[in-house]
Amino acid sequence: MNDLFSFPKNEVIKTNEKLGFKKSKTIEKANLRQSIRDCNFEATMNDLGGFPKSNQYFAIKTNGTSDCGSIFTYALNNWEEITEMYLATWTISKQNISRLKLAVESGKLKNLTMVFSSTLKGANPALYASLVGALKNFKNVKLKEINSHAKTFSISNGIDFLTVSGSANWSENPRIENFLLLNDKDLFEHHKDWMSELTDLV
């Protein structure tokens, strides 16, 4: 098991602070925080030689200095495109909603299937509205709101078939989380099948 991040505690970016800034300052700080988290993950992947090769995996844990969105961004930056993505999460941050939307708009993310918890609407109506409003009108995006607590996503560029599973949602978690990064086509197809089946339900 590799320690993904081993920074001193005073360098950990806390993501649950109550900010007293105007909205523009809040967004600016959130973007900076996310950029730092992305750099943390990129540095670790560089040390490991990039994503796992075919039929290999990395078992890693974090101390709260990165998240699923950082893994997704690393793929965007290192692959020519993501041809397919199958994503299941219980919740998601506004920054990561924006990442997905921008990736679809730019053409870097060709097809997205997303399964998310039916509790989101009641628990956080504003976040629910942001998620659905950002993605529902794209023809190459399928959304399914259902009773789910799954936390996994699978992406492919047509050559590699990466699945990321673990304890973390697509939110910014300032705590220890565990991840498995597996490059396995059969596992990719497994997640593709069950998420596609759910999104095809009325």
What is the predicted role of each segment?
Residues 1-82, 105-106, 120, 161, ...:
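N-terminal localization/anchoring segments of enzymes in phospholipid and broader phosphate metabolism
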Residues 62-63, 115-117, 143-146:
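Conserved beta-strand termini and adjacent loop/short-helix elements that scaffold enzyme active sites
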Residues 66-67, 91, 147, 186:
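Short beta->alpha linker loops
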Residues 69-136:
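Primarily the HKD phosphodiesterase
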Residues 107-112, 135-138, 175-177, 185-188, ...:
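Short, surface-exposed linear patches
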Residues 190-202:
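Cysteine/selenocysteine-centered motifs that mediate thiol-based redox chemistry or coordinate metal-sulfur cofactors
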